[in-house]
Amino acid sequence: MTEHDTLRGQLIEAETLITVDELCRHCTVRVEEVIIYVQEGILDPSDDIAVPEKADSWQFHISSVRRVQTAVHLQRDLGVNLAGAALALELMDRIAELERM
């Protein structure tokens, strides 16, 4: 990169919400997988209505994209089962909390 190159990006607030369809598109997963992630406690819809029948209206915080990508990586690339991925994400959350202290 030279001194005249310009970087462009979009600032996304932590409070930004995305639809379940947007989450699926960003993470290349199906809605059925998102439902399973919600049932396993990996994801929480922002409105706390975590019934699968309402999945089409679910919204998630933008940070859920990274969370799903990590879960997918753990499962597909590292062979971790769903319960193991949920546990790993929970431990990663706890570590992040401790680092913020």
Predicted regions and their residues:
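Arg/Lys-rich, alpha-helical DNA-contact motif
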Residues: 2-25, 31-35, 39-101
